[in-house]
Regions:
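Accessory alpha-helical DNA-binding modules that contact the DNA backbone or grooves
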Residues: 2-205
Length: 205
């Protein structure tokens, strides 16, 4: 079975002399934008829409196995693509030039061809995978599946209001507001229709 750790005592007498109390950062160490604490109080996150670290993390998540499952698009390749100015957001992945990708360090023609083939294959993914891949706060795999089953297409979901969203089983007000804010945010690029190639396939409920 699993063991759940519990802190029962703080042994202050074992602390080294001169220990300074830890303070949570109030600004992102990468982009300098303010950070905020999540509703559960367990996490802090950067609010910078243009934060390079967030951009990399979002792209890696988008390509991950449980999301769009783009084989060969790991952190190192994502970093190379972003560093070369080829990719700023997920939609850019679907407009890559194979010859330019092949010029990247440790890439080559064959690897570039394989990568572009994997990206093309991801267009056939169902809507639930795409929704999870967007990395919208409060929208995990389960929520993505029920939303895809209910609305059936990305356009229908984007047009839904809070009342319609909260009528979906397991979708509460916080998740509904997170979805609406994400789709309406001027800082959030519109979902690329090439990436939404599987948008007509709701996926399993």
């Amino acid at each position: 079975g699993r063991f759940i750790p519990e802190i029962v005592e703080v042994l202050k007498d074992r602390r080294p002399e001169g220990t300074v109390p830890y303070r949570l950062p109030d600004h992102c160490p990468v982009c300098g934008a303010p950070v905020v604490r999540d509703e559960d109080g367990a996490h802090i996150r950067c609010t910078g829409a243009e934060c390079p670290a967030q951009r990399l993390r979002h792209l890696v998540h988008f390509a991950s196995r449980d999301a769009m499952d783009i084989e060969g698009l790991g952190p190192a390749v994502v970093e190379s693509l972003v560093g070369a100015g080829m990719v700023q957001g997920p939609g850019d992945l679907y407009h890559l030039d194979g010859e330019e990708v092949a010029k990247l360090e440790r890439m080559g023609k064959k690897s570039a061809e394989n990568l572009l083939a994997a990206i093309e294959k991801s267009k056939s993914n169902d809507l639930s995978r795409l929704l999870f891949a967007f990395g919208i706060r409060q929208v995990g795999q389960k929520a993505a599946k029920v939303l895809a089953a209910r609305f059936g297409s990305l356009d229908a979901l984007m047009a839904a209001g809070e009342e319609e969203l909260t009528a979906v089983p397991d979708i509460g007000g916080i998740t509904a507001q997170s979805l609406i804010s994400w789709f309406q945010s001027p800082q959030q690029p519109a979902p690329d229709r090439d990436a939404a190639g599987g948008g007509g396939q709701p996926g399993e409920p």
